[in-house]
Amino acid sequence: MVTGKQTELIPIPFPPYQIPYSSKFTDSPAFIYFVAAFSVAGLYSIITSLLSGLALLKPGYAKQLVSHFVVVDVLLLGIVAAAIGAAGGVGYIGLRGNSHSRWTKICNIYDTFCQHLAGSIAAGLIASIVLVLLILLSFFTLSRKIPK
């Protein structure tokens, strides 16, 4: 998403000139939110990896860490899902436009930018599915440690 930037010559009707206009992810708050949400999720995954490694050295803290990880993982899943939805909505308007609001599609002009956008959203969807699977794994691990 961050590397998606494209400059094209856009024709203006009067007089018949073309002006360069660039499109980048900072043009949309939804794209900025997408980058910020996945940056936070990436930083959190690094921190949890380090803490999980430390928990292997001191097994007494493992139950507490897993329970905290499950809660924060679910919160991050909500943030990541909202970011994917916001970026996907703006991307869809860029792809198809909106005739009711008279927003024209831009992906026929900024094709490389839209390809970067689509790739980022697809990678984000895959990452969110992996996050759901990891949350389920953490939940089942935690439920096995609860005495019956």
Swiss-Prot record:
Q: Which residues cross the membrane?
A: 31-51, 74-94, 121-141
- Tell me which GO cellular component terms the UniProt record holds: plasma membrane
UniProt keyword annotations, A-Z = Cell membrane, Membrane, Transmembrane, Transmembrane helix
> What InterPro entries does this protein map onto?
CASP/CASPL, CASP_dom, CASPL
Pfam families under this entry? Answer: CASP_dom
What is the topology of this protein in the membrane according to its UniProt annotation?
Multi-pass membrane protein
Q: What is its main location?
A: membrane
Q: Please state where this protein is localized.
A: Cell membrane
State the oligomer form and interacting partners. Answer: Homodimer and heterodimers.
Entry similarity comment: Belongs to the Casparian strip membrane proteins (CASP) family.
* Protein name, as recorded: CASP-like protein 1
Q: What is the lineage of its organism?
A: Eukaryota, Viridiplantae, Streptophyta, Embryophyta, Tracheophyta
